[in-house]
Design a protein with these regions (language model features):
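Mixed-charge, Lys/Arg-rich low-complexity intrinsically disordered regions
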Residues: 1-7
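A broad helix-preferring feature
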Residues: 9-11
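Short, solvent-exposed secondary-structure boundary/capping segments
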Residues: 34-42
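Intrinsically disordered, low-complexity, charged/polar segments
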Residues: 44-64
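Short beta-strand-centered aromatic/proline hotspots
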Residues: 20-33
Length: 64
């Protein structure tokens, strides 16, 4: 699955964890047209944001 396949607000990780900690979980945000990337933030830190390309592989099959 890739970032562009997720809906806004869905949780994901960048590595395949079975039971990730709060620091390893991201939330998909809005698409930024000027940078052509998706803004994603950490679940545990609302001021942290990271821009990811739409074809970045993410993992959603985990227990949180």
């Amino acid at each position: 699955m890739t970032v562009k396949d997720l809906k806004i607000g869905e949780y994901f990780t960048l590595k395949p964890y079975a039971e990730p900690t709060e620091n390893q979980v991201y939330v998909r945000g809005e698409y930024d047209r000027s940078e052509r990337k998706y803004c994603c933030g950490k679940f545990s830190d609302i001021s942290y944001s990271r821009m990811l390309k739409g074809d970045t592989i993410v993992y959603t099959d985990f227990t949180f």
